[in-house]
Amino acid sequence: MSYTMEPLGNPSYRRVMTETRATYSRASASPSSGFRSQSWSRGSGSTVSSSYKRTNLGAPRTAYGSTVLSSAESLDVSQSSLLNGAAELKLSRSNEKEQLQGLNDRFAGYIEKVHYLEQQNKEIEAELAALRQKHAGRAQLGDAYEQELRELRGALEQVSHEKAQIQLDSEHIEEDIQRLRERFEDEARLRDETEATIAALRKEMEEASLMRAELDKKVQSLQDEVAFLRGNHEEEVAELLAQLQASHATVERKDYLKTDLTTALKEIRAQLECQSDHNMHQAEEWFKCRYAKLTEAAEQNKEAIRSAKEEIAEYRRQLQSKSIELESVRGTKESLERQLSDIEERHNNDLTTYQDTIHQLENELRGTKWEMARHLREYQDLLNVKMALDIEIAAYRKLLEGEETRFSAFSGSITGPIFTHRQPSVTIASTKIQKTKIEPPKLKVQHKFVEEIIEETKVEDEKSEMEDALSAIAEEMAAKAQEEEQEEEKAEEEAVEEEAVSEKAAEQAAEEEEKEEEEAEEEEAAKSDAAEEGGSKKEEIEEKEEGEEAEEEEAEAKGKAEEAGAKVEKVKSPPAKSPPKSPPKSPVTEQAKAVQKAAAEVGKDQKAEKAAEKAAKEEKAASPEKPATPKVTSPEKPATPEKPPTPEKAITPEKVRSPEKPTTPEKVVSPEKPASPEKPRTPEKPASPEKPATPEKPRTPEKPATPEKPRSPEKPSSPLKDEKAVVEESITVTKVTKVTAEVEVSKEARKEDIAVNGEVEEKKDEAKEKEAEEEEKGVVTNGLDVSPVDEKGEKVVVTKKAEKITSEGGDSTTTYITKSVTVTQKVEEHEESFEEKLVSTKKVEKVTSHAVVKEIKE
């Protein structure tokens, strides 16, 4: 208990002490009942005093102070009252008396309270002294207890020491007991051995006793025989004596005989005794020998038994140790089996958890793939929108830059067929986008994006190679620029001559074209088989469905393109031949001429296709540019071979990419090119050939050797030479387009007026240029070419344009060419639009084909 050092008069101290005393008195277990009663009385008094202290302890001082103040005030009042009057003095005195009486009463009460509190303080001091004595007694008891605890701890240590000693003794005793047990076991074994030997000896003694009994019986029988023989002998002797007595000399004989019998009996007795002694001696010797042999055998057996017992004991110890080891091994085996079972359970649980996590991750991966595909589709849509906007912006820029030249130069009907051809390409691009959206697998979209990046590098490498080849070809083109002018004139003359021949060969050309188309289809099938070997059946079904859809769309686009091409070419045919032949004639004559030109162009198309195939093969083996240069040497063939690199080479990849090429030969120039963008996803078959050995074919057509050649020659060569080359190409293109369009001249003769309108054609020209730029930029924005490499790709597309465009070397090159040669330049513009479509669609096809190949592998 802790006691505060506050003064005893402090009310807080009193309150605390009274409360502690009350609690202590209630909780105390002291033996004095009087103390208990006193504490209870104190507790009651303390409660009263505490309540009084809490309430009225501070009252005396305040009351006393108030009385003092009141007395002072009363004195003041009395003084004032003396001044004021006697009445007031009386009242004041009476008031003072009352106040003094009250103060006296209060003072008496305070004095009583003080006495009571002093008495209570004395009691508290006495109780405190008692408590201090108790506390001192407890401290002494604590010391005593500590001493006892020390003693007990020492005793405990001693006991623990004794216990350890006893444990050691017990261990030693156990060891002694173990040794005694071993000795006891040894003694027991020795006892058993001795008992066994004793039993054996007893058996031998029994056997000896039996033998002795037999010998006794024999002795008895011999004695009986001796007695019998003795009796017989006596009888015989008696008979003899009787016979002797019958004679005279009986007495003497009897004496003699008697002496003889006694001696004989003595001798016989001596012999029998000797014989019995001899037999006894022999029996003893035999028994001794037998006993010695048995003892020797017993000793030997004892040693053997002892060694055997030692071996048995050793074996027992080994057996015991082995049994202990076996038990330990069994325990370890059981523990290992339990551990193994636990591990298997944990492993199974882990497997289940891992499988669950794998399923969850697969589901999440599937969801992320779907989301990625959705984002990619959205990205593709945005890219397409961006491409369209970029193309429109570029087209508007070109239109603004070359607006005056175009209005002056292209007032004719040049751009009508271009617009018609461009329009299907735009529709095809839209259908292609729809196909991308339709494709459900998201892996395909992902890998498409990756393959676009890979194709980027490939296209850049190819373009770098093409630039090297173009640099060499540019020099050749510069040297042959003068020859090209003469060749153009010769080409025009030969074109006129070939028109007559082409009419006859039109039928043969159609048959040959059909054969070539069939061969191309076979090649496509072979390539598609090689590409589809690693693909799944689902992809083949999807490719077939896409191919059918692409064929239908291409058929529609080709129909529209043929109609537009026929209209435009019908309008163009008279001016195309206006410089060499005559001004435009009546529509009937123009149609007849167009038919002739179509026949001539059919033969040229066949030649161009053959040249294109050869050029494609040569491009695969070596550089793609070589077949184009020799074609430039000849007047008409150079022009036509320039076509094969652009339209026909572009068509050959389309043949490889889609089965629709039976219709392509007539529409070699444009209709299939717009249709090709639909094929980029059906052409998944060519995708594989691009990755195997054959992929160079689609690449070479995309980089048509001639188109890039015009690009490079345009840079080094003058614009006039470029214009001449463009004129040759435009003539060939016009022939091809005329072949396609004039086949349907009879059906579409009425539609010439619609295409003849210069304004409509100009609008179509602008739209086609925009679409061509859109396709080129679309291919670029797909991730393949965003740098000047894309501009080169556009030039490659434009090269055939560029041969027309190179004169300016900038954006509006086509307008200058059209100024030089109106009709042919218009046809060249057709080629430009077509070539742009070819390049763009080919690039897109590469991207899609790569994506399809990765899908098949996965």
UniProtKB/Swiss-Prot annotation:
It comes from the Eukaryota. Its main location: cytoplasm. GO terms for cellular component: axon; cytoplasm; intermediate filament; postsynaptic intermediate filament cytoskeleton. The modification N-acetylserine is found at S2. Glycans are attached at T47, T427. This is Neurofilament medium polypeptide. The lineage of its organism: Eukaryota, Metazoa, Chordata, Craniata, Vertebrata. GO terms for molecular function: structural constituent of cytoskeleton.
